[in-house]
């Protein structure tokens, strides 16, 4: 494939990803919600109370350090409680203050996301998901190959 065509594809996809990021930034700042807190709190909502920090890292694709520091911040602000499970696991539970924060800030943002997706016909949504999955898989494969070449 000619480099120019690839550059245009790359510029196009990176532009769209930047635009999505900008929209999220605007939405999160309108509620004064830091991105890490949004991701962790929405993960707790998805996974259910009693979930583990490890599960949040795995499903959110945030690194463990980011999840850990966000969990500590949420605990300090009394939005969550950590309860010991089988060592070394700590189960995460929302406090009343955390549930209120979730209701007032996190759920409305998720509802905005959901409404945008509801406007897409199912066939377009499936095409979007399939295309995105293919791009992610291809990208991951080439990153792995790049890393393998650079190990030598």
Residue ranges and their predicted role:
Residues 22-66:
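N-terminal helix-turn-helix DNA-binding core of bacterial DNA-binding proteins
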Residues 9, 16, 36-37, 52, ...:
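N-terminal positioning helix adjacent to the helix-turn-helix/winged-helix DNA-binding module
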Residues 13-20, 24, 101, 105-117, ...:
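Alpha-helical linker/hinge and terminal dimerization helices associated
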Residues 1-31:
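N-terminal leader segment of winged-helix/HTH proteins
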Residues 72-130:
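Charged, amphipathic alpha-helical coiled-coil/dimerization segments
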Residues 14, 42-43, 58, 103, ...:
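A cross-family signal for key residues in well-ordered alpha-helices
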Residues 1-4, 123-152:
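C-terminal regulatory/oligomerization modules of transcriptional regulators
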